[in-house]
């Protein structure tokens, strides 16, 4: 965040030049940076896959093309919730495929305070970040268990 690797195209270029570079996949900033539209095109999906192939850490926050952090239970954000869950599933599966059995994947529920979070006219958050973090954690634990029950999943 707030760095040279905040720009998706620049980051992809850096990865071409330094393929050994490991990242923390903060995908929400790429969604806003490139103003991704849903449904996502194949090109954008391939860009995110490249980021995930080079990531040893994943940040858990859901964005849409206008906002880097959206409420996960609002109906208008459900398409993005599913997109991010699919990306997390892919990122975790890719990480598991290249990591040793005793390795640790870091998944950080990175939910920021106001003004990162969406607020009302009084500056109060519209959601409960702690509860959202617990929900995201539960989703990721389920994804992990699903992948664990299907070893060797083809990506």
Which sequence ranges carry the predicted segments?
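Active-site glycine-centered loops adjacent to acidic/histidine catalytic or metal-binding residues
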Residues: 26
């Amino acid at each position: 965040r707030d760095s040279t690797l905040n720009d998706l195209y620049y980051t992809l270029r850096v990865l071409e030049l330094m393929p050994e570079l490991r990242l923390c996949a903060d995908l929400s900033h790429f969604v806003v940076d490139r103003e991704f539209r849903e449904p996502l095109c194949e090109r954008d999906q391939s860009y995110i896959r490249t980021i995930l192939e080079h990531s040893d850490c994943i940040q858990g926050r859901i964005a849409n093309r206008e906002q880097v952090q959206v409420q996960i239970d609002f109906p208008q954000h459900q398409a993005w919730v599913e997109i991010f869950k699919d990306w997390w599933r892919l990122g975790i599966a890719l990480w598991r495929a290249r990591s040793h059995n005793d390795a640790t994947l870091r998944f950080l529920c990175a939910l920021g305070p106001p003004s990162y979070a969406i607020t009302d006219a009084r500056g109060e958050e519209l959601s409960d970040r702690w509860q959202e973090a617990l929900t995201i954690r539960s989703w990721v634990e389920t994804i992990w268990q699903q992948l664990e029950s299907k070893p060797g999943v083809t990506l």
